């Protein structure tokens, strides 16, 4: 029989008592009253913060949005099909945040910064709040550097600067996303990090954009944040803020970033759905009263940092879809009033074969020529003026039967200038090539050509200058000025190429 030794037992008990660590943990918990349509009503959670993350018993995460006297309205970041009435919920004490790092470049992620491209986890040592305050007045400086889009119509007449917010607006199928993706393609070698946020888009459209970026080598400096049309409303609402947090990470590290929101009107619809289900009072077009704040707090995060903060920048290009050209609807007017200008794409121009279908007359950039290099300012002024006069004359010429020679010449020049602005998709032009193209048009060299020959000649001219007059591009890129030497080189090249071109056309 085993003998029991009391001293051993007492020693063991004494050791256990010494090692005992009394830990009191207070957990803020609640109970699910009802759940459905991506919304849960919770009883309890007395000390929960607005916007705090809460965790359900089966692992789903939600955000506390409505704090009422007897319950808390929570939006779910998932389908919530396993949540049951009466199950427990605990507050996490955290506000929504995401991991951030350089490793996100080249990846496709969702609104929670989780990879969805099947290429494994993303390593990150830092994190940022999804919602963070916009830089103050002292933290900013005025916009002065250009963000080249590669599109002649924009870079010459509606210039975008680094740190600006420029709205791209137009009906469906007018090439809005194409303008934005061309801008990303043009940032190759410009040391600009790009973030493309797809909100409520078709998965096939997002896949097409990602494929274009991969084929053109643009994914190296791009992050794609995607929440497609079948995603829960909560995640569609969060996606733009996730993209902004990633862009801010690079901006505060003294880098230049560009972020495209495609499109905020889908985010507003997701927010409207959440708000109505939370029984918040509806306002105009059934949107909640704070839908302006939804977009203003997002777009105000775009900035050009002051020299003390390293002069990084975040340029925002929101895309808004209009219904049959109605820019006076609620969301378009809101976003127009927040941004520093808009690029208006017209369905009529698109159908007339003018692509990109930018309506130069009503598009505007409130930063203006401050966001252009000197060489572009020198040649673009005349282009703007001549196109404006042409638009006026064209409307008048429809009613007049006999026009004098000067008017006919002006109309002919305008038609050739309009032709010069046409570009194929995914074919952005370097600023030197744009300057060369605009100069050729505004100085009348294209007047002798048929309208159908203009684009063919310009393609040949750009190739000719690249191979035979490389000094032209060197002068523009080094001095940023259209010098007399550059002008004489260009004149020679145009004349030589014109002679060759006319001979080829006759042959």
Swiss-Prot record:
InterPro entries found in the cross-reference section: ATP_synth_asu-like_sf, ATP_synth_asu_C, ATP_synth_asu_C_sf, ATP_synth_F1_a_nt-bd_dom, ATP_synth_F1_asu, ATPase_a/bsu_AS, ATPase_F1/V1/A1_a/bsu_N, ATPase_F1/V1/A1_a/bsu_N_sf
Entry keyword Endoplasmic reticulum: no
Enzyme Commission code(s) on record: 7.1.2.2
Superkingdom of origin: Eukaryota
Residues the UniProt record annotates as site (Required for activity): 363
Cell compartment(s), UniProt: Plastid, Chloroplast thylakoid membrane
Molecular function via GO: ADP binding; ATP binding; proton-transporting ATP synthase activity, rotational mechanism
Membrane topology field: Peripheral membrane protein
Function comment: Produces ATP from ADP in the presence of a proton gradient across the membrane. The alpha chain is a regulatory subunit.
HAMAP family: ATP_synth_alpha_bact (MF_01346)
Protein name per its UniProtKB record: ATP synthase subunit alpha, chloroplastic
Organism from which the protein derives: Coffea arabica
Organism lineage: Eukaryota, Viridiplantae, Streptophyta, Embryophyta, Tracheophyta
Name of the gene: atpA
């Amino acid at each position: 029989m085993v003998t029991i030794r009391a001293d051993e037992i007492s020693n063991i008990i004494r050791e256990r008592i010494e090692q005992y660590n009394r830990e009191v943990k207070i957990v803020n918990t609640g109970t699910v009253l009802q759940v459905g349509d991506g919304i849960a009503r919770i009883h309890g959670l007395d000390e929960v913060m607005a916007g705090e993350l809460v965790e359900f018993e089966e692992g789903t995460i939600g955000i506390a949005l409505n704090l009422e006297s007897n319950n808390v309205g929570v939006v779910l970041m998932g389908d919530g099909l396993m949540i049951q009435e009466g199950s427990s919920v605990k507050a996490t004490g955290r506000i929504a945040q995401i991991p951030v790092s350089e490793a996100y470049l080249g990846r496709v992620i969702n609104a929670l910064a989780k990879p969805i491209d099947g290429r494994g986890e993303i390593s990150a040592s830092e994190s940022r709040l999804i919602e963070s305050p916009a830089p103050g007045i002292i933290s900013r400086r005025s916009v002065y550097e250009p963000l080249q889009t590669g599109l002649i119509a924009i870079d010459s007449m509606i210039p975008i600067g680094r740190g600006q917010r420029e709205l791209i607006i137009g009906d469906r199928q007018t090439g809005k996303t194409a303008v934005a993706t061309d801008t990303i393609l043009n940032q190759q070698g410009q040391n600009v990090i790009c973030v493309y946020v797809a909100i409520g888009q078709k998965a096939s459209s997002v896949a097409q954009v990602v494929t274009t970026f991969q084929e053109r080598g643009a994914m190296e400096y791009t992050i794609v944040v995607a929440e497609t049309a079948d995603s829960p409303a909560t995640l569609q609402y969060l996606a733009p803020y996730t993209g902004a947090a990633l862009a801010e990470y690079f901006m505060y590290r003294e880098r230049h970033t560009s972020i495209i929101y495609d499109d905020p009107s889908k985010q507003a619809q997701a927010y409207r759905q959440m708000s109505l289900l939370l029984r918040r009072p509806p306002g105009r077009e059934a949107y909640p009263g704070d839908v302006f704040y939804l977009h203003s707090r997002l777009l105000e995060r775009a900035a050009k940092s002051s020299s003390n903060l390293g002069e990084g920048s975040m340029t925002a290009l929101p895309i808004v879809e209009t219904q049959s050209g109605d820019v006076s609807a609620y969301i378009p007017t809101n976003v127009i009033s927040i941004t520093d200008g808009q690029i208006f794409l017209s369905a009529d121009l698109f159908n007339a074969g003018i692509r990109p279908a930018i309506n130069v007359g009503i598009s505007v950039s409130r930063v203006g020529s401050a966001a252009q290099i000197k060489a572009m300012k020198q040649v673009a002024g005349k282009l703007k003026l001549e196109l404006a006069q042409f638009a006026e004359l064209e409307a008048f010429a429809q009613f007049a039967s006999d026009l004098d020679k000067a008017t006919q010449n002006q109309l002919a020049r305008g038609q050739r200038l309009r032709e010069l602005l046409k570009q194929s998709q995914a074919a952005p032009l370097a600023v030197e090539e744009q300057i060369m193209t605009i100069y050729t048009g505004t100085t009348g060299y294209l007047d002798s050509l048929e309208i159908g020959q203009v684009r063919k000649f310009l393609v040949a001219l750009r190739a000719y200058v690249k191979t035979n007059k490389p000094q032209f591009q060197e002068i523009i890129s080094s001095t940023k000025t259209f010098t007399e030497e550059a002008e004489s080189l260009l004149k020679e090249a145009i004349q030589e190429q014109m002679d060759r071109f006319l001979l080829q056309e006759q042959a």
